Amino acid sequence: MEELNTIKLSDHLTPFLTFNRQQWAELRKSVPLKLTEQDLKPLLGFNEELSLEEVSTIYLPLARLINYYIEENLRRQTVLKRFLSGHNPKVPYIISIAGSVSVGKSTSARILQSLLANWPVARKVDLITTDGFLYPLEILQKKNLLQKKGFPISYDTQRLIRFLADIKSGKKNVKAPIYSHLTYDIIPNQFDIVDRPDILILEGLNVLQIGSNKSNQMFVSDFVDFSIFVDAEEDQLKEWYIKRFLKFCRSAFTDPNSYFKHYANLSEQEAIETASQIWDNINGLNLKQNILPTRERANLILKKGENHKVELVKLRK
């Protein structure tokens, strides 16, 4: 591939290099795909159909790039260890994945986790979602924030920052709260344990947010080594959200323990109208006000088109 074909003239006016699918796929080089169809199935989101071709075209080159960055980071740590006479702890490499509701962040995170964990260089890769750092339902209700759930104000950001600081300082057995999508709440006294991984993937809506609280001197992004933003046009995102909502009405919402069980008896038209209103009043608003403005802060942007296929990749120079 000729360099002139890869780097467009317009790239000189932006901080990003832009690649189409074919150009990006060529950067996989000879890296083999070890993932099988059977391995892929449990990694997919509720409303996603993603092929092994998508994994090899988009995610394998990305995993290859990230491994280069990790190797460089390890070299820097070796220099620091030598300078400090061996007194610095192991520092995990933190990757963040941001983007809108329904864009497929969780699927991207799980696929990347699988690829990085099965790389020729054996590495321990943990995955944590920021959902666990939402305020409990009771607190959101008291603060009248239920309609702002998913907005930056609905997260216990200081708790998340303390969690990341502990991870970066090399602490053992750091606890992360667990969120239940069934009950729409934090599960009391249950935690994921993160014990000094080589790589931590942090997935969530607002992980690139720099916050509105001017007294905060530290942000989630301060602890992140490589940031990814999964992007798509809003009309596409809304369509995916409505389709997912319809499927939930016929599955998860029918569970008597579901917080949203009152949606289970909606007709299809009622469900479409309800999902559309939720998008317009909550998710779409959060996208415009808080999520989309952080996109250009990412190290890499995956721009999706129809069927969750990535059409463009933008890599920060």
From Swiss-Prot:
GO terms for biological process: coenzyme A biosynthetic process. Its main location: cytoplasm. Transmembrane segments: none annotated. Pathway: Cofactor biosynthesis; coenzyme A biosynthesis; CoA from (R)-pantothenate: step 1/5. It is found in: Cytoplasm. GO terms for cellular component: cytoplasm. It catalyses: (R)-pantothenate + ATP = (R)-4'-phosphopantothenate + ADP + H(+). Keywords: ATP-binding, Coenzyme A biosynthesis, Cytoplasm, Kinase, Nucleotide-binding, Transferase. GO terms for molecular function: ATP binding; pantothenate kinase activity. InterPro entries: P-loop_NTPase, PanK, PRK/URK. The keyword Transmembrane helix does not apply. Its EC number is 2.7.1.33. ATP binds at G99, S100, V101, S102, V103, G104, K105, S106. Belongs to the prokaryotic pantothenate kinase family. This is Pantothenate kinase. It comes from Histophilus somni (strain 2336) (Haemophilus somnus).
